[in-house]
Structures are given as C-alpha cells and as structure tokens.
Regions:
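Signature of the SF2 helicase/ATPase Hel1-core->accessory helical subdomain module
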Residues: 52-55, 263-369
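Conserved helicase motor
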Residues: 217, 238-247, 262-267
C-alpha cells in the first residue's frame, strides 16, 4: 500500500470537507491528507479569534461518537492531527481513548508546536505548512519520528528539537565528519532522542556497531528498559564484561545496538585491566584481543550525560582502540572553559578539558533560559 523504503515516492493528495456518515450522525472533516489514497493526517481549522483547542475538543467528540469513522473506515489509519486558527497551530498523535482525552483541566495527550532548528516557534499556519507539510518532510515525520509503544498501545511523537538532534547526528555520520555533542536541557527526553538516533544507525550498512554508553549500572538498566519500551527486544542485558564482549564480536543484527556502562567497556578494552590480566595468566584470549578485529570498523558511540565520566583514561582508550569510531555526547550541562574543573595531563602538560575538547562541535542545542 505504501512505499516504506522511499516515502517521498508515494502519491500525496489533499481532500477538503470530507463527509462520512456514522451510525447516528455524519461527520465532516475540514482537510484530510492522503498517502496513496490512505488518510494519514487530519487538519481541523477554526476562524481567527477562536481557540484551536475548540478544534481539539471537536476531534475528541468525533472519536467518541458511536460508529465513528476512526473505527469503521480508513480513518483508522490517521497518524496525526493538526489544529489551527491561522495564528496558532498545534499537532498531536492519534491514539486510542486511553491516551486521548481533553477537558477543561487540560487533561490531554502531548500537544506540540512546530519549531525551527534554532527552536523558534512556528505558529502561523502558512509558515507551518511550508516547514512541516512538504511531502518528504511529512513522510519523514510519520515514518521516522513517531514511535509506537506497543506494550502501552500508545503513539509518541518526537519534539522538533529531538528531530533536529537526530538529523544532525545522522548527517554527521553520513558525511563522516568527526564527533559532536547535543546540548539538551535536563528533562527534555534525551533517552528517546538517543534511542531514535541509535535505531536509525542500525539501518545504516556502513556502521558496524552502535553503543549507547552510560556511566552507572542503574542507568544501564533504566536505559535498556526504556529502549525496549520504545521497541520491544531492542537491546539485551549485558550482565558482565564477558556478555558485552560477546555482543561486540557478534555478527547478529540484533546485537548491532548495544547499551552498556563505561566501566564494562573500559574493562574490556584496557589490556592492563584486572580481568584482562587474569585471562592472560590463565592462558585465555583477553577481551582486548578478542575485540582487536573491530579496530578498523566504523563504530558509533553515544554517551549519555557526557559531562560526567568522559574525562579520563577510559575516553582516551576508546578513541585509541577504535580510530575510525565517531563519538557523540548528550548533556544537559556541558563543560565550558569558565566551569571546567578537571585537568587532562598529556605530554606532561596539564590543561582544563571542556565538552568541546572531547566532542569537537555542538550539533544542536535546546536550552531553557
């Protein structure tokens, strides 16, 4: 029905004032966007001066109507809704009744406003249409930046700044132009952003492995659970360093995305670590020797809260062991020269290290000031 390999090659159509009869009444929808004849986006418009929240309530009422088109017709394929009164424009994902409610207390599923890459809001319907609704842009939003949480039967939409961050990482990797960091404020959904970046890299045949690296065991478990919430069976638990090494050397597609702690990774790579020394004493191949064939592979490392544990020997070990790797960091509080406190000693010269020193360039920023 739909070309999912190249969404831009599908046929896009616009239908105005679509009318559908229900069991008890009829409903008329202002604008419907179709992909290959399948309704994908519904737009409800209000006149200037009337709150677009009236349109939101109207959609909720439509969905509550017995025998409504969202359950008995092709409207069940609608992915997202857009509401506007011309100067204010919002959009939100289609969901089942459990996650779809709106009342005077604003008990509502997440509502979004579009924004430019510099985070400036795009609210006027004309500007919104120019930015959000071009055929390829809309198809990309639906195909790449909406996440179905199957266990909760809930659809999530990535916010604009999350999309820009993922696209910046993706472009940096496609152009193979070094490392970078994402500065997104605490609580802005970095786990979802990093999940999407990691899983899109899984589709890139030029990348051998993608590792999402955290600095504490509890974050390892928490991140793994979140990744698997977004996509069931996305990552497996690495109970110890040996399990991590097995997945690193595995050619199984399921092991292409790995969540681990920086401590496990450091123990595996450092030939002077206790584990590697003990294996050598027993005549067993060390972890670092097992991983040696990966040294010429294109690897991607994404570090969570990269301001915490990226200063030190482990970071240098990773960069030295994987010379073709690209490293990306997520942080809510980057280290700048004015707040740098950790000194890096190289060639007997001590200097303060910043986030930019380690990750080269800021790829995207979203801060609340």
């Amino acid at each position: 029905l739909v070309n999912i390999k190249d969404w831009c090659k599908n046929t896009f159509e616009v239908v105005n004032q679509l009318r559908i009869n229900t069991d008890n009444s009829f409903q008329r929808y202002d604008v419907m966007l179709l992909i290959n004849g399948i309704p994908a986006v519904q737009i409800e418009l209000k006149t200037l001066g009337i709150s677009p929240r009236r349109a939101m309530q109207q959609i909720v009422d439509y969905k509550k109507d017995p025998g409504n088109g969202y359950t008995k017709t092709l409207l069940c394929f609608v992915q997202l809704f857009i509401v506007s009164n011309r100067t204010e424009t919002y959009y939100f994902a289609n969901n089942n009744d459990r996650h779809f409610a709106f009342d005077a207390d604003e008990n509502f599923l997440p509502i979004y406003q579009h924004a430019a890459e510099d985070n400036e809001k795009i609210t006027h319907i004309d500007d919104f249409a120019d930015s959000f609704l071009p055929k390829c842009a809309l198809a990309t939003t639906i195909s790449r930046y909406m996440v179905l949480v199957a266990s909760e039967r809930k659809m999530l939409m990535m916010r604009p700044y999350q999309v820009y961050a993922v696209e910046a990482i993706d472009q940096c990797i496609r152009e193979n132009r070094g490392n970078g960091y994402i500065w997104h404020t605490t609580g802005s959904g970095k786990t979802l952003t990093s999940f999407k970046a990691s899983t899109l890299l899984k589709l890139n045949p030029d990348i051998h492995k993608c590792l999402f690296v955290v600095d504490r065991k509890d974050l390892d478990r928490q991140t793994r659970e979140e990744f698997n919430r977004f996509q069931e069976g996305c990552v497996e638990e690495n109970t110890n360093t040996a399990a991590l090494v097995r997945r690193l050397v595995s050619d199984d597609y399921a092991d292409k995305v790995i969540v681990t702690t920086i401590q496990k990774l450091g123990l595996a790579l450092d030939e002077n670590s206790t584990r590697n020394k003990n294996r050598a004493k027993r005549g067993r191949t060390t972890y670092s020797d097992q991983l040696a064939p990966l040294s010429d592979k294109r690897m991607v490392f994404i570090f969570d809260e990269c301001h915490r544990s990226q200063f030190g020997q482990t970071h240098r070990t990773i960069k030295n062991f994987f010379p073709k790797a690209q490293l990306f960091g997520f942080t809510g509080t980057p280290i700048f020269p004015e707040n740098a406190t950790i000194r890096q000693i190289e060639d007997n010269v001590a200097s303060l290290r910043t986030t930019e020193d380690l990750f080269q360039s800021e790829l995207h920023a979203y801060t609340i000031t």
